[in-house]
Amino acid sequence: MEPPQVPAEAPQPRASEDSPRPERTGWEEPDAQPQELPEKSPSPALSGSPRVPPLSLGYGAFRRLGSCSRELPSPSPSWAEQPRDGEAELEPWTASGEPAPASWAPVELQVDVRVKPVGAAGASRAPSPAPSTRFLTVPVPESPAFARRSAPTLQWLPRAPSPGSTWSRGSPLAANATESVSPAEGCMVPPGSPACRCRCREPGLTKEDDALLQRAGIDGKKLPRAITLIGLPQYMKSLRWALVVMAVLLAVCTVAVVALASRGGTKCQPCPQGWMWSQEQCYYLSEEAQDWEGSQAFCSAHHATLPLLSHTQDFLRKYRITKGSWVGARRGPEGWHWTDGVPLPYQLFPADSEDHPDFSCGGLEEGRLVALDCSSPRPWVCARETK
Protein backbone atom coordinates (compact mmCIF):
# COMPACT_ATOMS: atom_id res chain seq x y z
CA MET A 1 0.00 0.00 0.00
CA GLU A 2 1.37 3.41 -0.91
CA PRO A 3 1.60 6.04 1.82
CA PRO A 4 -1.31 8.50 1.76
CA GLN A 5 -0.67 11.84 0.13
CA VAL A 6 -1.22 15.01 2.15
CA PRO A 7 -3.47 17.46 0.28
CA ALA A 8 -3.02 21.17 0.38
CA GLU A 9 -6.56 21.66 1.58
CA ALA A 10 -9.26 19.03 1.76
CA PRO A 11 -12.96 19.87 1.94
CA GLN A 12 -14.37 19.29 5.35
CA PRO A 13 -17.91 18.10 6.10
CA ARG A 14 -20.34 20.84 6.93
CA ALA A 15 -20.83 20.95 10.67
CA SER A 16 -23.81 22.28 12.52
CA GLU A 17 -23.74 25.55 14.40
CA ASP A 18 -23.61 23.76 17.75
CA SER A 19 -20.69 21.49 16.85
CA PRO A 20 -17.19 23.00 17.18
CA ARG A 21 -15.39 23.93 13.98
CA PRO A 22 -11.82 22.71 13.51
CA GLU A 23 -9.11 25.33 13.06
CA ARG A 24 -6.77 25.44 10.14
CA THR A 25 -3.46 23.72 10.62
CA GLY A 26 -0.02 24.91 9.67
CA TRP A 27 -0.07 22.90 6.47
CA GLU A 28 -2.77 25.02 4.82
CA GLU A 29 -2.10 28.31 3.06
CA PRO A 30 -4.56 31.13 3.53
CA ASP A 31 -5.08 31.73 -0.18
CA ALA A 32 -4.69 28.14 -1.34
CA GLN A 33 -7.39 26.74 -3.55
CA PRO A 34 -8.53 23.08 -3.36
CA GLN A 35 -7.19 21.00 -6.20
CA GLU A 36 -6.98 17.34 -7.02
CA LEU A 37 -3.63 15.65 -6.80
CA PRO A 38 -2.41 13.17 -9.36
CA GLU A 39 -2.07 9.56 -8.40
CA LYS A 40 1.71 9.62 -7.93
CA SER A 41 2.34 13.23 -6.91
CA PRO A 42 5.22 13.54 -4.45
CA SER A 43 4.38 14.47 -0.88
CA PRO A 44 5.46 17.94 0.29
CA ALA A 45 8.85 18.11 1.90
CA LEU A 46 8.75 18.60 5.61
CA SER A 47 11.54 19.70 7.87
CA GLY A 48 13.17 17.03 9.96
CA SER A 49 12.68 13.32 9.62
CA PRO A 50 10.05 12.04 7.17
CA ARG A 51 6.66 11.46 8.71
CA VAL A 52 5.34 8.05 7.78
CA PRO A 53 1.72 7.36 8.85
CA PRO A 54 0.66 3.95 10.17
CA LEU A 55 -0.47 1.49 7.55
CA SER A 56 -3.81 0.67 9.11
CA LEU A 57 -4.85 3.61 11.28
CA GLY A 58 -4.30 6.39 8.73
CA TYR A 59 -2.71 9.71 9.48
CA GLY A 60 -4.26 12.00 12.05
CA ALA A 61 -3.91 13.71 15.40
CA PHE A 62 -5.90 14.69 18.44
CA ARG A 63 -6.43 18.39 18.96
CA ARG A 64 -8.16 20.07 21.86
CA LEU A 65 -11.19 22.17 20.99
CA GLY A 66 -10.26 25.82 21.00
CA SER A 67 -6.51 25.14 20.85
CA CYS A 68 -4.37 27.87 19.37
CA SER A 69 -1.62 25.54 18.24
CA ARG A 70 -1.33 25.14 14.46
CA GLU A 71 1.37 22.50 14.43
CA LEU A 72 0.28 18.88 14.09
CA PRO A 73 2.39 16.22 15.73
CA SER A 74 4.42 13.70 13.86
CA PRO A 75 2.56 10.40 13.95
CA SER A 76 4.53 7.48 15.31
CA PRO A 77 3.61 3.88 16.14
CA SER A 78 4.42 4.45 19.80
CA TRP A 79 1.38 6.64 20.31
CA ALA A 80 -0.78 5.53 17.39
CA GLU A 81 -0.99 1.95 18.56
CA GLN A 82 -0.51 1.34 22.25
CA PRO A 83 -1.88 -1.92 23.78
CA ARG A 84 -3.59 -1.53 27.09
CA ASP A 85 -5.13 -4.63 28.72
CA GLY A 86 -5.68 -6.33 25.39
CA GLU A 87 -7.17 -3.23 23.72
CA ALA A 88 -5.76 -0.56 21.42
CA GLU A 89 -5.44 2.82 23.10
CA LEU A 90 -4.43 6.14 21.50
CA GLU A 91 -2.19 8.47 23.43
CA PRO A 92 -3.11 12.12 22.84
CA TRP A 93 -0.63 14.77 21.78
CA THR A 94 -0.15 17.77 24.06
CA ALA A 95 0.89 21.05 22.57
CA SER A 96 2.94 23.61 24.42
CA GLY A 97 0.95 25.61 26.91
CA GLU A 98 -1.93 23.11 27.08
CA PRO A 99 -2.99 21.14 30.18
CA ALA A 100 -1.96 17.58 30.88
CA PRO A 101 -3.90 14.72 29.25
CA ALA A 102 -5.62 13.89 32.53
CA SER A 103 -7.37 17.29 32.50
CA TRP A 104 -8.22 17.45 28.79
CA ALA A 105 -11.53 18.71 27.51
CA PRO A 106 -13.29 17.07 24.53
CA VAL A 107 -11.02 16.87 21.48
CA GLU A 108 -11.30 16.38 17.75
CA LEU A 109 -9.64 13.62 15.78
CA GLN A 110 -8.53 14.64 12.29
CA VAL A 111 -7.74 11.67 10.08
CA ASP A 112 -6.43 11.71 6.52
CA VAL A 113 -7.80 8.56 4.88
CA ARG A 114 -6.60 7.50 1.47
CA VAL A 115 -8.90 4.97 -0.17
CA LYS A 116 -7.45 3.05 -3.09
CA PRO A 117 -9.93 0.61 -4.65
CA VAL A 118 -8.62 -2.76 -5.64
CA GLY A 119 -8.63 -3.25 -9.41
CA ALA A 120 -10.07 -6.16 -11.36
CA ALA A 121 -8.38 -9.51 -11.81
CA GLY A 122 -4.93 -9.70 -13.37
CA ALA A 123 -6.28 -10.99 -16.66
CA SER A 124 -8.59 -7.98 -17.01
CA ARG A 125 -7.21 -4.95 -18.86
CA ALA A 126 -9.71 -2.52 -17.40
CA PRO A 127 -7.88 0.39 -15.68
CA SER A 128 -8.23 0.72 -11.93
CA PRO A 129 -10.18 3.72 -10.63
CA ALA A 130 -8.16 6.65 -9.39
CA PRO A 131 -7.61 6.75 -5.62
CA SER A 132 -9.58 9.29 -3.64
CA THR A 133 -8.43 11.27 -0.63
CA ARG A 134 -10.73 12.24 2.20
CA PHE A 135 -9.94 14.46 5.16
CA LEU A 136 -12.31 13.61 8.03
CA THR A 137 -12.88 15.42 11.32
CA VAL A 138 -14.32 13.19 14.02
CA PRO A 139 -15.36 14.82 17.35
CA VAL A 140 -14.33 12.71 20.34
CA PRO A 141 -16.44 13.25 23.50
CA GLU A 142 -13.72 12.27 25.97
CA SER A 143 -9.96 12.39 26.04
CA PRO A 144 -8.37 9.13 24.79
CA ALA A 145 -5.99 9.22 27.75
CA PHE A 146 -8.92 8.73 30.09
CA ALA A 147 -8.70 5.11 31.32
CA ARG A 148 -11.75 2.94 30.74
CA ARG A 149 -11.52 1.42 34.17
CA SER A 150 -11.80 4.81 35.85
CA ALA A 151 -15.22 5.41 34.22
CA PRO A 152 -17.04 2.09 34.07
CA THR A 153 -20.39 3.77 33.49
CA LEU A 154 -19.38 5.13 30.05
CA GLN A 155 -20.75 3.13 27.17
CA TRP A 156 -18.31 2.58 24.33
CA LEU A 157 -19.39 2.06 20.78
CA PRO A 158 -18.53 -1.31 19.21
CA ARG A 159 -15.52 -1.09 16.93
CA ALA A 160 -16.81 -2.43 13.66
CA PRO A 161 -14.95 -1.63 10.41
CA SER A 162 -16.87 0.50 7.94
CA PRO A 163 -17.02 -0.43 4.22
CA GLY A 164 -14.02 0.84 2.28
CA SER A 165 -11.95 1.76 5.32
CA THR A 166 -8.63 0.26 6.36
CA TRP A 167 -9.58 -0.15 10.02
CA SER A 168 -8.57 -3.54 11.45
CA ARG A 169 -7.38 -4.65 8.00
CA GLY A 170 -3.69 -4.70 8.78
CA SER A 171 -3.47 -3.98 12.51
CA PRO A 172 -3.55 -6.93 14.91
CA LEU A 173 -4.19 -4.58 17.82
CA ALA A 174 -7.36 -3.26 16.24
CA ALA A 175 -8.52 -6.77 15.49
CA ASN A 176 -7.92 -7.86 19.08
CA ALA A 177 -9.80 -4.83 20.36
CA THR A 178 -12.76 -5.66 18.15
CA GLU A 179 -12.82 -9.26 19.31
CA SER A 180 -12.58 -8.36 22.99
CA VAL A 181 -15.80 -6.35 22.80
CA SER A 182 -18.80 -8.61 22.28
CA PRO A 183 -22.01 -6.69 21.54
CA ALA A 184 -24.02 -9.88 22.06
CA GLU A 185 -22.90 -10.00 25.63
CA GLY A 186 -23.50 -6.31 26.16
CA CYS A 187 -20.24 -5.94 28.04
CA MET A 188 -17.31 -3.70 27.05
CA VAL A 189 -14.80 -5.36 29.36
CA PRO A 190 -12.99 -8.62 28.66
CA PRO A 191 -15.43 -11.58 28.85
CA GLY A 192 -13.43 -13.36 31.52
CA SER A 193 -13.26 -10.47 33.98
CA PRO A 194 -15.35 -10.56 37.22
CA ALA A 195 -17.10 -7.31 36.27
CA CYS A 196 -18.45 -8.87 33.09
CA ARG A 197 -19.60 -12.00 34.90
CA CYS A 198 -21.44 -9.94 37.52
CA ARG A 199 -22.87 -7.28 35.22
CA CYS A 200 -23.45 -8.99 31.92
CA ARG A 201 -24.86 -12.32 32.99
CA GLU A 202 -28.58 -12.52 32.36
CA PRO A 203 -30.87 -14.43 34.74
CA GLY A 204 -32.08 -17.81 33.65
CA LEU A 205 -30.78 -21.27 32.97
CA THR A 206 -27.11 -21.59 32.04
CA LYS A 207 -25.50 -24.28 29.94
CA GLU A 208 -24.51 -26.17 33.08
CA ASP A 209 -28.12 -26.10 34.29
CA ASP A 210 -29.37 -27.40 30.94
CA ALA A 211 -26.83 -30.23 31.07
CA LEU A 212 -27.94 -31.24 34.57
CA LEU A 213 -31.60 -31.18 33.54
CA GLN A 214 -30.94 -33.28 30.45
CA ARG A 215 -28.99 -35.77 32.55
CA ALA A 216 -31.95 -36.03 34.95
CA GLY A 217 -34.40 -36.45 32.06
CA ILE A 218 -36.23 -33.15 32.64
CA ASP A 219 -37.19 -30.75 29.86
CA GLY A 220 -36.00 -27.24 30.67
CA LYS A 221 -38.87 -25.69 28.67
CA LYS A 222 -41.49 -27.26 30.94
CA LEU A 223 -40.01 -25.94 34.20
CA PRO A 224 -41.91 -23.40 36.31
CA ARG A 225 -41.46 -19.73 35.52
CA ALA A 226 -39.65 -19.18 38.83
CA ILE A 227 -36.78 -21.41 37.70
CA THR A 228 -36.34 -19.58 34.42
CA LEU A 229 -36.38 -16.20 36.16
CA ILE A 230 -34.05 -16.78 39.12
CA GLY A 231 -32.03 -19.69 37.76
CA LEU A 232 -31.80 -23.31 38.79
CA PRO A 233 -29.13 -22.90 41.56
CA GLN A 234 -31.07 -20.13 43.31
CA TYR A 235 -34.30 -22.11 42.96
CA MET A 236 -32.72 -25.23 44.46
CA LYS A 237 -31.32 -23.17 47.34
CA SER A 238 -34.75 -21.71 48.14
CA LEU A 239 -36.27 -25.19 47.83
CA ARG A 240 -33.81 -26.58 50.36
CA TRP A 241 -34.70 -23.81 52.81
CA ALA A 242 -38.40 -24.56 52.34
CA LEU A 243 -37.78 -28.24 53.09
CA VAL A 244 -35.84 -27.33 56.24
CA VAL A 245 -38.69 -25.12 57.46
CA MET A 246 -41.23 -27.87 56.78
CA ALA A 247 -39.10 -30.41 58.66
CA VAL A 248 -38.86 -28.10 61.68
CA LEU A 249 -42.63 -27.53 61.70
CA LEU A 250 -43.28 -31.27 61.45
CA ALA A 251 -40.96 -31.95 64.39
CA VAL A 252 -42.69 -29.29 66.50
CA CYS A 253 -46.13 -30.74 65.70
CA THR A 254 -44.96 -34.25 66.61
CA VAL A 255 -43.61 -33.11 69.98
CA ALA A 256 -46.83 -31.21 70.69
CA VAL A 257 -49.00 -34.25 69.91
CA VAL A 258 -46.89 -36.52 72.13
CA ALA A 259 -46.99 -34.01 75.00
CA LEU A 260 -50.75 -33.60 74.78
CA ALA A 261 -51.28 -37.36 74.63
CA SER A 262 -49.10 -37.92 77.70
CA ARG A 263 -50.95 -35.23 79.63
CA GLY A 264 -54.34 -36.65 78.69
CA GLY A 265 -56.77 -37.64 81.41
CA THR A 266 -57.84 -41.19 82.06
CA LYS A 267 -56.85 -43.90 79.68
CA CYS A 268 -59.56 -46.00 78.15
CA GLN A 269 -59.28 -49.46 79.74
CA PRO A 270 -61.76 -51.95 78.34
CA CYS A 271 -63.91 -53.96 80.71
CA PRO A 272 -66.02 -57.00 79.87
CA GLN A 273 -69.37 -56.35 78.32
CA GLY A 274 -71.92 -55.34 80.95
CA TRP A 275 -69.29 -54.13 83.40
CA MET A 276 -68.64 -50.54 84.48
CA TRP A 277 -65.26 -48.85 84.65
CA SER A 278 -64.39 -46.47 87.51
CA GLN A 279 -61.15 -45.53 89.24
CA GLU A 280 -58.99 -48.14 87.49
CA GLN A 281 -61.45 -50.96 88.38
CA CYS A 282 -64.31 -52.78 86.70
CA TYR A 283 -67.63 -53.27 88.51
CA TYR A 284 -70.55 -55.56 87.86
CA LEU A 285 -73.97 -54.65 89.26
CA SER A 286 -76.27 -57.66 89.30
CA GLU A 287 -79.99 -57.48 88.62
CA GLU A 288 -80.68 -60.90 90.14
CA ALA A 289 -80.62 -62.03 93.78
CA GLN A 290 -78.56 -64.84 95.28
CA ASP A 291 -77.22 -65.87 98.65
CA TRP A 292 -73.77 -64.82 99.75
CA GLU A 293 -72.08 -68.06 98.64
CA GLY A 294 -73.63 -67.94 95.16
CA SER A 295 -72.70 -64.28 94.73
CA GLN A 296 -69.07 -64.95 95.71
CA ALA A 297 -68.91 -67.91 93.30
CA PHE A 298 -70.15 -65.73 90.42
CA CYS A 299 -67.53 -63.08 91.12
CA SER A 300 -64.74 -65.63 91.39
CA ALA A 301 -65.73 -67.10 88.01
CA HIS A 302 -65.12 -63.65 86.47
CA HIS A 303 -61.83 -63.14 88.32
CA ALA A 304 -63.46 -60.74 90.72
CA THR A 305 -64.61 -60.60 94.36
CA LEU A 306 -67.35 -59.03 96.35
CA PRO A 307 -66.52 -55.40 96.92
CA LEU A 308 -64.30 -54.35 99.80
CA LEU A 309 -65.29 -51.13 101.46
CA SER A 310 -61.68 -50.08 101.74
CA HIS A 311 -61.41 -50.04 97.92
CA THR A 312 -64.96 -49.46 96.68
CA GLN A 313 -66.42 -47.06 99.19
CA ASP A 314 -66.40 -44.13 96.79
CA PHE A 315 -68.02 -46.18 94.03
CA LEU A 316 -70.76 -47.52 96.33
CA ARG A 317 -71.44 -44.03 97.63
CA LYS A 318 -71.59 -42.61 94.10
CA TYR A 319 -74.19 -45.07 92.85
CA ARG A 320 -76.05 -45.19 96.22
CA ILE A 321 -76.61 -48.91 96.40
CA THR A 322 -79.32 -49.20 99.10
CA LYS A 323 -80.92 -52.56 98.32
CA GLY A 324 -78.80 -54.41 100.83
CA SER A 325 -76.40 -55.98 98.33
CA TRP A 326 -73.67 -58.33 99.46
CA VAL A 327 -70.16 -57.15 100.18
CA GLY A 328 -66.95 -59.08 100.68
CA ALA A 329 -67.06 -59.23 104.51
CA ARG A 330 -67.70 -62.29 106.65
CA ARG A 331 -67.46 -63.24 110.35
CA GLY A 332 -65.25 -66.18 111.28
CA PRO A 333 -63.87 -67.71 114.47
CA GLU A 334 -61.42 -64.80 114.75
CA GLY A 335 -63.95 -62.07 114.01
CA TRP A 336 -64.90 -60.05 110.97
CA HIS A 337 -62.52 -60.03 107.98
CA TRP A 338 -62.51 -59.35 104.27
CA THR A 339 -62.49 -62.07 101.66
CA ASP A 340 -58.76 -61.51 101.12
CA GLY A 341 -58.10 -62.33 104.83
CA VAL A 342 -57.48 -58.78 106.02
CA PRO A 343 -59.31 -58.07 109.34
CA LEU A 344 -61.96 -55.37 109.33
CA PRO A 345 -61.15 -52.18 111.20
CA TYR A 346 -63.02 -51.84 114.47
CA GLN A 347 -64.92 -48.75 113.27
CA LEU A 348 -66.37 -50.77 110.36
CA PHE A 349 -67.87 -53.55 112.51
CA PRO A 350 -71.63 -54.01 111.91
CA ALA A 351 -73.64 -52.32 114.66
CA ASP A 352 -76.16 -55.16 115.19
CA SER A 353 -73.68 -58.02 114.92
CA GLU A 354 -73.89 -58.64 118.69
CA ASP A 355 -77.69 -58.88 118.59
CA HIS A 356 -77.68 -61.49 115.79
CA PRO A 357 -74.77 -63.88 116.36
CA ASP A 358 -76.04 -66.23 113.61
CA PHE A 359 -75.73 -63.46 110.98
CA SER A 360 -72.22 -64.07 109.65
CA CYS A 361 -72.28 -62.33 106.21
CA GLY A 362 -71.90 -58.64 105.59
CA GLY A 363 -74.21 -56.53 103.47
CA LEU A 364 -74.67 -52.90 102.58
CA GLU A 365 -77.81 -50.99 103.50
CA GLU A 366 -78.21 -47.23 103.24
CA GLY A 367 -74.48 -46.83 102.83
CA ARG A 368 -73.38 -48.69 105.97
CA LEU A 369 -72.16 -52.23 106.72
CA VAL A 370 -74.69 -54.55 108.42
CA ALA A 371 -74.75 -58.24 109.44
CA LEU A 372 -77.17 -60.35 107.36
CA ASP A 373 -78.27 -63.95 107.01
CA CYS A 374 -75.96 -65.68 104.53
CA SER A 375 -78.81 -67.76 103.04
CA SER A 376 -81.08 -64.83 102.19
CA PRO A 377 -81.17 -63.91 98.48
CA ARG A 378 -79.81 -60.41 97.74
CA PRO A 379 -78.26 -58.59 94.78
CA TRP A 380 -74.49 -58.33 94.68
CA VAL A 381 -71.62 -56.30 93.25
CA CYS A 382 -68.40 -57.72 91.81
CA ALA A 383 -65.19 -55.72 91.57
CA ARG A 384 -61.87 -56.43 89.87
CA GLU A 385 -58.87 -54.53 88.73
CA THR A 386 -58.39 -53.70 85.10
CA LYS A 387 -55.94 -55.75 83.05
Swiss-Prot record:
Disulfide bonds listed in the record: 299-382, 361-374
Q: Where is the composition biased (Basic and acidic residues)?
A: 15-27
Q: Which SUPFAM superfamilies match?
A: C-type lectin-like
Q: Gene name?
A: Klrg2
Q: How does it sit in the membrane?
A: Single-pass membrane protein
Keyword match Cell inner membrane: no
The UniProt entry's GO CC annotations, sorted and at most eight, read: membrane
Where is this gene product found? Membrane
Give the source's domain of life in one word: Eukaryota
Q: Name one Pfam family in it.
A: Lectin_C
Q: Where are the transmembrane segments?
A: 241-261
UniProt-listed InterPro entries: C-type_lectin-like, C-type_lectin-like/link_sf, CTDL_fold, KLRG2, NKR-like_CTLD
Q: Which residues form the C-type lectin domain?
A: 278-383
Q: What is its main location?
A: membrane
Q: Name one GO molecular function term.
A: carbohydrate binding
Q: Specify the protein name.
A: Killer cell lectin-like receptor subfamily G member 2
Keywords of this entry:
Disulfide bond, Lectin, Membrane, Phosphoprotein, Transmembrane, Transmembrane helix
